[in-house]
Amino acid sequence: MKRFFLSLLFFLVISDAYSNSEYQHGYAFLSQLKYPQGFEHFSYVNPDAPKGGTFRIPEMGAWDSFNPIPLRGRPLSGLDIWDPVDNFIYDSLLEGSLDEPSSYYAKLAKGVRVAPDGSYVDFKIRDDARWHDGRPISIEDVLFTFDVYMTKANPSIRTPLEIIERLEVLDQDEIRFWIAEESIGDPIVPIRIGVLSILPKHY
């Protein structure tokens, strides 16, 4: 009976997460999104907080690299590829909400769409997304990023991305991630893809 209940619960979680195949402003699989379309900031953020100053990060030991992608080297703090909260240089397609259990909102993306059966995840890039030098962030940057992660990165990045079968460009601002058969239906997949830092192809 317990096994049946857990199986039913997992099915309901997946069904809820994949129930809408239109573009959404966020993705959640344990509850409904708390924040509406077009919200300006998370409720725990003070938009009137002072800007500027110096930000210091404590670090144990030494570091010898600004690049967390290769296997060699020990990168400094603040460049976590998997955690947008701990990456102070590059943004991601989705951003997690700290006051919800499993909700992620479009950041570099302006929308996320998951297939009803979980076989693909689509992202639409924001028109106003820019790099630090002012150049627009494009689908080419997303393609470049995942090519690097899936073929040249260290195993801690490359192996989890075996969930992706291939990428397909749908339009100049839309990209589709086709999911490997064994990972179809896993509600974590859109999050795993969406939180990765996007890299500039031109840099």
Where is each model-derived feature located?
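Sec-dependent N-terminal signal peptides
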Residues: 4-13
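Short loop segments at secondary-structure junctions
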Residues: 98, 128, 180-182
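Surface-exposed binding/hinge segments that line
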Residues: 124, 158-203
